[in-house]
Amino acid sequence: MSSSSETCFVHPNAIVETKKIGNNTRIWAFVHILPQAMIGDNCNICDHCFIENDVFIGNNVTVKSGIYIWDGVYIEDNVFLGPNVVFTNDVFPRSKVYPESFGRTIVKKGASIGANSVIVAGNIIGEYAMVGAGSVVTRDIPDYALAYGNPARIKGYVCQCTSKLKFIDNQAVCQCGKRYKYADGIVSQLII
């Protein structure tokens, strides 16, 4: 991540106060980014988004239109955020009452969150997890989990390529060739 990258695109109708924007990042119309936010390389921040100060966005992240990312949200590399995803940062909000600290929400590497989902403060979306559209996430979602609903519940597991995994004797082989194991409620990729 460079400081005030010369190779990023900022639409003339965007307000970008931060100098911490990576190379080849595109920021479209009516986006407002506050001064302390950090945005990595090759990101795409679509129209009508707001990004607060205590926000980190990694490399190769897609932020679709209508998303507000509040203080305390940390987004790792290769994450997809569908249109109008909602992040909260205060579990017990009141007007003009400010918490000493905001809940920390982490979206891990390769995760995808479907359109109009709500991510309640303080939760972790695991690596390559997939949250279905319109879901309300009220607890952590583990790596590779496919979760959806209100509240979001684990309905299965997906490969990095997004294909649904079918476990037999706690092992799965995806059509793309990647192998996984399931043990003690945790899915992990087998490197062979």
UniProtKB/Swiss-Prot annotation:
- Biological source species: Aneurinibacillus thermoaerophilus
Q: What is this protein called?
A: dTDP-3-amino-3,6-dideoxy-alpha-D-galactopyranose 3-N-acetyltransferase
The protein's superkingdom reads Bacteria
| Catalytic activity field | dTDP-3-amino-3,6-dideoxy-alpha-D-galactopyranose + acetyl-CoA = dTDP-3-acetamido-3,6-dideoxy-alpha-D-galactopyranose + CoA + H(+)
Q: Which GO terms describe its molecular function?
A: transferase activity
According to its UniProt entry, the function of this protein is described as: Catalyzes the transfer of an acetyl group to dTDP-D-Fucp3N to form dTDP-D-Fucp3NAc in the biosynthesis of dTDP-3-acetamido-3,6-dideoxy-alpha-D-galactose, a glycan chain of the S-layer.
Protein's UniProt keywords contain Magnesium = no
The UniProt family comment states: Belongs to the transferase hexapeptide repeat family.
Gene behind this protein: fdtC
The record's PANTHER family line, in alphabetical order, gives: ACETYLTRANSFERASE, ACYL-[ACYL-CARRIER-PROTEIN]--UDP-N-ACETYLGLUCOSAMINE O-ACYLTRANSFERASE
Q: What class of enzyme is it?
A: transferase
Task: Extract the InterPro entries matched here.
Answer: Hexapep (IPR001451), Trans_hexapeptide_repeat (IPR050179), Trimer_LpxA-like_sf (IPR011004)
Which keywords annotate this record? Transferase
**Protein EC:** 2.3.1.197
